[in-house]
């Protein structure tokens, strides 16, 4: 960012006590990355690498591939119990390891390994929840916008954008109309943690565009909205389609659940019987 646009943003931030400089904005750059991926039911699922949370969805799918969801009621307590336990295991790893890889090693290969998936799947008890997992710290945000475009030549774009909280930081650069995000909330303040705040560092990021690939070609760019929910949403939609044969609309409309910080959040469409089954499992 340079010129009048950068000056407008820096002036606003400086007026609020920020130490931002024109050089900071001029040095801002995007980068090309190699997607990370796993295989689920014969399809490749591709995600953005850390600092994004896409790896969380892939860890979930690796766990669920060992459970055998296809024989379960897609709207039943057992299916959702397995999905939520896989999510809790995956988010626990996310909050311990996912960070800006340019500031330290993020063990992507280990997190996506068959060995780890086997170990995590073996921890799931079909009759009760795992007790010794960390509580998710993220608020559940609902203001993300996702879009996808495919042209006549099947070039595909999977795109997602968000200021994080509603109206981001609430700070507006008056001349340009730029509303600043508050993605710094994704950092932790624990010294020595891979995701501890530092100058020039990118925080753990929730927005994750994805693609399904078959025989080397993209067949479905996809994404969901909801902040921290997105990784669960990816795994849920893919499972709905590949385990249960739902079409895209059915997969999106199907009842959802999320292991929130205080309790399990479940969609209104989930039956009383399924809810009671989840309560019985803890």
Descriptions of predicted regions:
Residues 2-14, 224-246:
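Alpha-helical support elements that line or immediately flank enzyme active sites
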Residues 46-54, 144-148, 158-171, 224-230:
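Glycine-rich phosphate/pyrophosphate-binding beta-alpha loops
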């Amino acid at each position: 960012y340079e010129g009048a646009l950068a000056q407008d943003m820096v002036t606003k931030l400086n007026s609020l006590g920020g130490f931002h400089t024109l050089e900071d904005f001029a040095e801002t750059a995007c980068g090309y990355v190699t997607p990370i991926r796993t295989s689920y039911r014969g399809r490749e699922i591709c995600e953005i690498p850390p600092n994004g949370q896409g790896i969380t969805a892939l860890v979930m799918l690796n766990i669920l591939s060992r459970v055998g969801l296809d024989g379960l009621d897609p709207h039943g307590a057992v299916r959702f119990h397995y999905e939520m336990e896989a999510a809790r295991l995956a988010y626990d790893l996310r909050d311990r390891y996912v960070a800006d890889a340019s500031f330290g090693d993020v063990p992507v290969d280990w997190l996506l390994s068959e060995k780890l998936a086997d170990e995590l799947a073996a921890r799931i008890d079909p009759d009760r929840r795992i007790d010794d997992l960390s509580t998710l710290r993220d608020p559940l945000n609902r203001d993300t916008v996702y879009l996808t475009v495919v042209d006549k030549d099947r070039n595909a774009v999977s795109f997602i954008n968000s200021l994080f909280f509603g109206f981001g930081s609430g700070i507006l650069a008056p001349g340009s109309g730029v509303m600043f995000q508050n993605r710094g909330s994704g950092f932790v303040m624990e010294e020595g943690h891979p995701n501890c705040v530092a100058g020039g560092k990118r925080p753990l990021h929730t927005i994750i565009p994805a693609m399904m690939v078959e025989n080397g070609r993209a067949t479905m760019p996809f994404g969901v909205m909801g902040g921290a929910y997105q990784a669960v949403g990816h795994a849920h939609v893919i499972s709905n389609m590949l385990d249960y044969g739902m079409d895209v609309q059915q997969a999106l409309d199907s009842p959802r659940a999320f292991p929130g910080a205080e309790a399990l959040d479940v969609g209104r469409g989930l039956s009383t019987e399924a809810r009671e089954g989840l309560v019985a499992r803890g």
